[in-house]
UniProtKB/Swiss-Prot annotation:
Region of interest: Required for interaction with CDH1: 221-301
Family: Belongs to the angiomotin family.
Gene Ontology CC: bicellular tight junction; cell junction; cell projection; cytoplasm; cytoplasmic vesicle; plasma membrane; podosome; recycling endosome
One GO-annotated biological process of the protein: establishment of cell polarity involved in ameboidal cell migration
Subcellular location: Recycling endosome; Cytoplasm; Cell projection, Podosome; Cell junction
Sites of Phosphotyrosine modification: 107
Residues covered by region (Required for interaction with CDH5): 101-301
Species of provenance: Bos taurus
Protein name from the UniProt record: Angiomotin-like protein 2
GO molecular function, one term: actin filament binding
Site note Required for interaction with YAP1 and ubiquitination at K-341 and K-402, residues: 214
Polar residues bias spans: 64-79, 176-193, 291-302
Start-end of Gly residues biased regions: 524-533
PANTHER family: ANGIOMOTIN, ANGIOMOTIN-LIKE PROTEIN 2
């Protein structure tokens, strides 16, 4: 176990050192966290490990980088901290950082780029003619960009960068190959189509870029400037330089530097000779170079091709090394993952072992305490058992002595009990003879009590019947008095209403006479002054219409009073029927209660003798109940017959009620006296009828007191103001005109509809 932990610790130390030198900041922090977790686990299990041991093994420069890596940057400045850490390294000073938004291709895309570039090697070299007139500063800037890309090139190889640079400069020549590829969308994205041949632009000849600059090339003056720069002297030793940079500097051939200078000189020379066919298409028309320029271009192109072959071979070798290193890195990462899983499992097992040991120690302590408690309990129970045995022996001894004494005393007690039982038997025989004599006397008394109870029940029945008759007579007297009072009130109200109607009729007749006289006076000068009589005619017409409307209002009010009176009568009859039914039910209940068997003090003696009398009383009570039901039904039948007699005499909705309603009240009173025979009185009905009769008088007074205009009345049947026929016309049709006739018809229809609605409402209430 200890050996495995040591081996995993050494592997982690090596990984951390390599990551501090060649890796990025996030992976370094991850490995440091893993190491600290492993050290904590080892220190918790064994207690011998020290977290400061791996820090002592590291190199000074690694510990310095570790201190910078473990420092926590402020929030929102993560990128700034990373760039500060990278700027302190000498290699990153030589390699400027790329833009943050630069998109890096994957390994598969780089491999496809290299294959595509190898297929394009056989064609003519297109970079000679595409020179940028800007000169060497553009090439140095591209070299700086290539070195900046080398900082992020842990996964990308040199062939990827070469292919990207060559495609950026030669993308205009082969657009069809790029756009036709569906497998590499990044190639098709970065390409732009060339301009049409023979179509000159207003800006003159199109500037082209310099030949491809490879990231492994570093010019002499740039190298010297980077070394002589005072910013780089502090950390310019080979110890701080990256291994790949040292290899690339060693692999730069000495011949390549003057050739680069020659290429920069070619950018400043005019093109005197004709370029090759594939370059002539890209150059503008009318531009030609001298023969010396063509020869130098050919020689430089051949040397450049030879250098490209060497670079490609080196690129293939580096690619193989990269793949091998990548496989080793994957295997190492897999081993590290396994080691981490093993460490976590070991830590989990150690924690489980500790928990088991703690649980076992607790269990042992608990078992020990329970054993001690059980031993003490057993000792206590043994002592208690010993005491119980002693007490049982003493109790057995006392019980044996007591049984002997009890046997001696029981024999004496048996002799005494036998003597007492003989005496009690003699007394029992004597009591039986006395009981037989008493039973005979009790039977005689029971017969006398039955006779007395029969006489008492007969007397009570006669008294109850007399009381019932007395109550009925009193109720009849009270009803008659209340009906007489109600009748007097109704008669007074009717007389008052007749007087009011008579006064109203006389007043209306006087107004009618006055109106006819006015009409005659207005009709005599009608031929001479037609223009002056028009407002008088309109005033007469309006006054006549006002009278008609007031007459209709009076007729409707009279109908309303008639229907109110009829509703009160019907309500009184219905209330009388309900009171009759309630009275019959109450009488039936009182009869049952009074004739029910009542317990008496001597009922325990004569229960067997009074069964026949009780049956007879029950039969009588049932007969009385049936008689009360028959009376109730007779009352309902009489009410229905009276209502059926009143139905044929109903007045039509358009006609008015008769003036005198006294005979109808007498008929209702006579029917009530016939139906109330044998029933109890209803105080609520009499009070309601008296109250409604008293309320009708103030309702009729405003009708007569209100100021009314003159009305034209018709011939009445019984001397009252109400009539059945239609009203006579007060003026001719020539005076009324068409508009007044239409208004009168509409008013009549409205009044008729109101009367019908009111009659329907009354019928619903009934």
């Amino acid at each position: 176990m200890r050996t495995l932990e040591d081996s995993s610790g050494t592997v982690l130390h090596r990984l951390i050192q390599e990551q501090l030198r060649y890796g990025n900041l996030t992976e370094t922090r991850t490995l440091l966290a893993i190491q600290q977790q492993a050290l904590r686990g080892g220190a918790g299990a064994g207690g011998t490990g020290s977290p400061q041991a791996p820090m002592e093994i590291m190199a000074p420069e690694d510990s310095q980088v570790l201190q910078q890596a473990t420092r926590q940057e402020p929030q929102g400045q993560e990128h700034q901290g990373t760039e500060t850490h990278l700027a302190e390294n000498g290699l990153y000073r030589l390699c400027p950082q790329p833009g943050k938004g630069e998109e890096l291709p994957t390994y598969e895309e780089a491999k496809a780029h290299s294959q595509y570039y190898a297929s394009q090697q056989a064609g003519p070299w297109p970079h000679v003619g595409d020179r940028d007139p800007r000169g060497p500063p553009g090439g140095s800037r591209r070299q700086d960009e290539a070195l900046r890309e080398l900082r992020h090139g842990h996964v990308r190889s040199l062939s990827e960068r070469l292919l990207q640079l060559s495609l950026e400069r030669n993308g205009a020549r082969t657009p069809s190959h790029m756009s036709a590829s569906h497998s590499f969308p990044q190639l098709a994205r970065n390409q732009q189509g060339p301009p049409a041949r023979g179509a000159p632009t207003a800006e003159g000849p199109e500037p082209r870029g310099p030949p491809p600059q490879y990231p492994h090339v570093m010019l002499a003056h740039e190298t010297t400037s980077a070394v002589t720069d005072p910013r780089y002297r502090a950390r310019g030793s080979p110890h701080f330089q990256h291994a790949e940079v040292r290899i690339l500097q060693a692999q730069v051939p000495p011949v390549f530097l003057p050739q680069q200078q020659q290429q920069y000189q070619y950018l400043q020379q005019p093109q005197e000779r004709h370029p090759p066919p594939h370059l002539a298409a890209l150059s503008p028309p009318g531009v030609e170079g001298p023969a010396s320029t063509q020869a130098s271009l050919a020689t430089s192109g051949s040397t450049h091709l030879a250098q490209m072959e060497t670079v490609l071979r080196e690129n293939a070798r580096l690619q193989r090394d990269n793949e091998r290193l990548q496989r080793e890195l994957e295997s190492t990462a897999e081993k590290a993952g396994r080691i981490e899983k093993l460490e976590s499992e070991i830590q989990r097992l150690s924690e489980a072992h500790e928990s088991l040991t703690r649980a076992s120690s607790k269990r042992e302590a608990l078992e020990k305490t329970m054993r001690n408690k059980m031993d003490s309990e057993m000792r206590r129970l043994q002592d208690f058992n010993r005491d119980l045995r002693e007490r049982l022996e003493s109790a057995n001894r006392r019980l044996a002595s007591k049984t002997q004494e009890a046997q001696a005393g029981s024999q004496d007690m048996v002799a005494k009990l036998l003597a007492q039982s003989y005496e009690q038997q003699q007394e029992q025989e004597k009591l039986e003879r006395e009981m037989a004599l008493l039973r005979g006397a009790i039977e005689d008394q029971r017969r006398r009590a039955e006779l007395l109870e029969q006489a008492l029940s007969n007397a009570q029945g006669r008294a109850a019947r007399a009381e019932e008759e007395l109550r009925k007579k009193q109720a009849y007297v009270e009803k008659v008095e209340r009906l007489q009072q109600a009748l007097g009130q109704l008669q007074a109200a009717c007389e008052k209403r007749e007087q009011l109607e008579l006064r109203l009729r006389t007043r209306l007749e006087q107004e009618l006479k006055a109106l006819r006289a006015q009409q005659r006076q207005a009709g005599t000068p009608g031929g001479g002054g037609g223009s002056g009589g028009t407002p008088e005619l309109s005033a007469l017409r309006l006054s006549e219409q006002l009278r008609e409307k007031e007459e209709q209002v009076l007729a409707l009010e009279a109908d309303m009073t008639k229907w109110e009176q009829k509703y009160l009568e019907e309500r009184a009859m219905r209330q009388f029927a309900m009171d009759a039914a309630a009275t019959a039910a109450a009488q039936r209940d009182t009869t049952l209660i009074r004739h029910s068997p009542q317990p008496s003090p001597s009922s325990s003696f004569n229960e067997g003798l009074l069964t026949g009398g009780h049956r007879h009383q029950e039969m009588e009570s049932r007969l009385k109940v049936l008689h009360a039901q028959i009376l109730e039904k007779d009352a309902v039948i009489k009410v229905l017959q009276q209502r059926s007699r009143k139905d044929p005499g109903k007045v039509t909705p358009g006609s008015l009620r008769p003036a005198k309603s006294v005979p109808s009240i007498f008929v209702a009173a006579a029917a009530g006296t016939q139906g109330w025979q044998g029933h109890s009185s209803s105080e609520r009905q009499v009070d309601a009828s008296a109250q409604l009769a008293a309320d009708r008088a103030p309702l009729e007074e405003p009708v007569a007191v209100a100021p009314l205009a003159a009305h034209a009345k018709h011939g009445s049947r019984d001397g009252s103001t109400q009539t059945d026929g239609p009203p006579d016309s007060l003026e001719p049709d020539s005076l009324l005109g068409c508009s007044s006739g239409q208004r009168t018809a509409s008013l009549d229809s409205i009044a008729t509809s109101r009367v019908q609605d009111f009659s329907d409402m009354v019928e619903i209430l009934i």
